[in-house]
Design a protein with these regions (language model features):
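Membrane-proximal, non-transmembrane interaction regions of membrane/secretory-pathway proteins
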Residues: 1-12
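Exposed, interaction-prone extracellular/peripheral surfaces
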Residues: 6, 15-56, 60-247
Length: 247
């Protein structure tokens, strides 16, 4: 005779195993350091607010596709870790945490440094199963540390997407009059005449972005530069393209 209780339990187990193998397991990793509070014009969103809105849209898409999604937020330390789940009620938890993240960031405004590489290693060591890791950051840290952290995920067979958020002014450097620049993380101030080093700044900025692009490409990491005047659908389409390739 068949032990129906054992059969039912086994059946549920195999269904669960199948779902875990076919559905994606994703983690949204958000940099909330003080440099992410920057915006050059009131018409642009601060980088963090843009990133939070992007993360909320991604979480919604993932839950709708019955993918599990988790969240890690950090500045110079881990601020929040929420394991991945795929149930509809989990979306409310994630959105609530993203709302809190913005509120805390506005209260702090300045003085929060960043340790991107360390935070990536922390998450890589916690993930036991392969999945998709989505980093949302301005990458304002030592490139060596950031890239080593990203490669840690690839070594463990995770797929990785990097949304590199930049304010348009950080790329074009439109400043012409004497300006006081403030480092939002260290709070150091520099009063200077921008035209004296604008060309050098642009060269270094171009080289910095190019390095991220090249090394990410070499390690099959999807690198997407997103300036905060870019419509969200551009970034979301890149995610959907990646999601389609994984199935």
């Amino acid at each position: 005779s068949v032990d129906w209780k054992v059969y039912a339990k086994s059946d549920r187990f195999f269904i669960k195993e199948f779902e875990e193998e076919t559905n994606l397991r994703g983690y949204l990793v958000i940099d909330s350091s003080s440099s992410m509070a920057y915006r050059s014009q009131d018409t642009y969103l601060p980088k963090l607010e843009y990133g939070v809105d992007l993360a909320a849209a991604l979480a919604y898409l993932m839950i709708r596709q019955q993918d599990a999604v988790g969240l890690l937020t950090f500045d110079d330390q881990i601020r929040k870790f929420i394991p991945a789940r795929s149930v509809g009620s989990h979306l409310r938890i994630l959105l609530g945490e993203l709302k809190l993240l913005l509120r805390h960031a506005r209260d702090a405004e300045r003085g929060l440094g960043t340790r991107i590489g360390q935070s990536l290693h922390h998450l890589a060591d916690r993930l036991s199963r392969r999945g998709l890791v989505i980093l949302i950051s301005d990458l304002m840290d030592r490139p060596e540390d950031v890239l080593t952290g990203l490669k840690h995920f690839r070594h463990r067979q995770h797929e990785v997407v990097v949304f590199h958020l930049l304010d348009p002014a950080e790329v074009s450097f439109p400043f012409e009059e004497e300006t006081v620049f403030v480092d939002l993380e260290s709070e150091a101030r520099l009063s200077t005449t921008p035209w004296e080093f604008a060309d050098d700044y642009k060269r270094q900025m171009d080289a910095w972005r190019k390095r991220y692009r090249q090394i990410c490409a070499e390690h099959s990491i999807d690198y997407v530069e997103v300036q905060t005047d870019t419509p969200f659908d551009v970034a979301l389409l890149r995610y959907l393209e990646k999601r389609r390739r994984l199935h």
